[in-house]
Amino acid sequence: ACNFQSCWATCQAQHSIYFRRAFCDRSQCKCVFVRG
C-alpha cells in the first residue's frame, strides 16, 4: 500500500525545490515536480 505522508516526504526529499506534490496511484507513490 502507498502511505501518503511517507510518499510526500520521499518525493520532497528527492526533488527538493522542484517538488510540487505527491499522490498515491493505487499502491504506487507518484511524484509531481517541475523539471528545472
UniProtKB/Swiss-Prot annotation:
Modified positions (Glycine amide) in chain numbering: G36
Source superkingdom: Eukaryota
Annotated GO biological process: defense response to bacterium; defense response to fungus; killing of cells of another organism
Keywords for this protein: Amidation, Antibiotic, Antimicrobial, Disulfide bond, Fungicide, Secreted
Transmembrane segments: none
Subcellular location: Secreted
Stated induction or repression of this protein's expression: By bacterial infection.
Name by which UniProt lists this protein: Termicin
Lineage: Eukaryota, Metazoa, Ecdysozoa, Arthropoda, Hexapoda
